[in-house]
Each structure stands twice: as C-alpha cells, then as structure tokens.
C-alpha cells in the first residue's frame, strides 16, 4: 500500500480524523473527571474542602511522567485533527459544485453537520483561551499561588479557576466554547464510527444515541464549572 497516497487521500484523511477524534474523546473523559473534583466543595459533599481534592488531583496529574508524556501526544492529536479537518472541508467544498447542488445535497443534513469547520474554529479559539488561562501559568510560567497539603506544596489551581470565572465575559465565552464542542460532538461522535466502517443503521442509531448522551453529560459538566464558580456555588471561601 502507498501510505503517502493513503494519508493524503480524502478517505485516509477522514480515517486519521476519526482516530484522533477517538483519542481526543478519551481525553475529554479524563479531563472532565479531573475537573469535576471542584464539585466536592458543594454543600452536600464537603463545603470545607475549598478545592483540596481538585488541587491534589491536579498535582498528581502534573507530577505523573505518563500524563506529561500523554500531553505531547494530546497536542499532536489536536494539531493533526485540526489540520486534517480543514483540508477535508476545503476539498469537500471544491467537490460540491454549485450552490444549487450543495442545497440539494444538504437537504437531509443537520446544520451542525454542515458547520463542522466553523465549530472546530470556535473550539480552537476556546482552546487557546483555556490553555492561556490555566495550563500556561500552571506548567510553563509557574505563576500560581502555592498551597500545601500535608508536606506537599502544589499550585492552587482551584483559586485560579475561581478568580478567572469571576469575570462574566469569560464565563460567557467558556459556555459558548462548550456549546460549540457539544454540536461538534453531536455529529463527530457517530461519524467517526461510520468512517471506521460501521454502516449498519441499527448500530449507527445506537451510536447516535450514545453520542448524544455522552455529549450532554460531558458538556453540561464543563459548562457548570464556570457557572458554579461565578455564582459562588463552588468557591475557595
């Protein structure tokens, strides 16, 4: 097989997008699981936690060699997924022909399935904002306030989150980013399986339902994080 031709073909690019998409979905599960530790501060868990569970979990992840290695693959996965997505979108636009032909071909599709490139761009901009707010000061500049648990000193990332989400504009931008992610996943989740060879209507419908459920759980949790901190449901005080 000519691998160079395969990975530059439309089918090959879509397979690469599907595989990197699966990898990024697994990251979302890990990321939302870690960040959900902030909710341990809620009154029905431990209102005196003050971010302790989240900070200790974040410290463990940041100190793990395996996790740091995975971050490299994560960034590569994002870059490859984004580049391949734009290339496929440009090629598809060239193949669609006239606007009349596009209208005929898109009558049965959802608006978000036709807007994956736009949604992907919004997610990319959201990702830049998110990384600059938390990952850079935590991993690169080390400008976060310290906090000590037992004999272990770590970054007070919980306080940084709270401080960041006191700005209503940032909260709105984060919610927009999460909504963009939701619509991107609504189409991308089952489409990735279809690209990998699942064409049975019964299984595709099942995967669509699974994808919708997965997306709602992940994105509702992500959206609740800035909202709950802005409304002081979760706080370091």
Predicted regions mapped to residue ranges:
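Membrane-embedded alpha-helical bundles that constitute the cytochrome b-like, heme-associated redox core
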Residues: 1-237
């Amino acid at each position: 097989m000519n691998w160079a031709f395969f990975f530059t073909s439309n089918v090959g690019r879509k397979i690469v997008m599907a595989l990197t998409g699966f990898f990024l979905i697994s990251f979302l599960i890990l990321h939302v699981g870690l960040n959900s530790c902030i909710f341990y501060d809620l009154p029905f868990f431990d209102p005196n936690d003050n971010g302790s569970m989240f900070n200790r979990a974040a410290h463990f992840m940041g100190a793990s060699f395996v996790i740091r290695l995975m971050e490299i693959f994560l960034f590569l996965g994002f870059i490859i997924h984004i580049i391949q997505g734009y290339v496929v979108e440009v090629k598809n636009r060239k193949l669609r022909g006239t606007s009349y032909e596009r209208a005929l071909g898109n009558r049965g599709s959802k608006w978000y399935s036709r807007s994956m490139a736009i949604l992907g761009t919004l997610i990319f901009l959201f990702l830049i904002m998110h990384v600059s707010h938390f990952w850079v000061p935590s991993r690169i500049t080390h400008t976060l306030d310290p906090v000590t648990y037992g004999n272990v000193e770590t970054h007070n990332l919980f306080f940084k989150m709270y401080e960041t989400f006191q700005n209503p504009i940032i909260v709105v931008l984060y919610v927009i980013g999460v909504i963009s992610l939701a619509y991107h996943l609504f189409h991308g989740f089952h489409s990735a399986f279809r690209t990998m060879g699942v064409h049975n209507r019964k299984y595709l419908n099942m995967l669509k339902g699974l994808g919708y459920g997965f997306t709602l759980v992940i994105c509702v949790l992500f959206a609740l994080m800035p909202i709950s901190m802005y409304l002081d449901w979760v706080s370091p005080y």
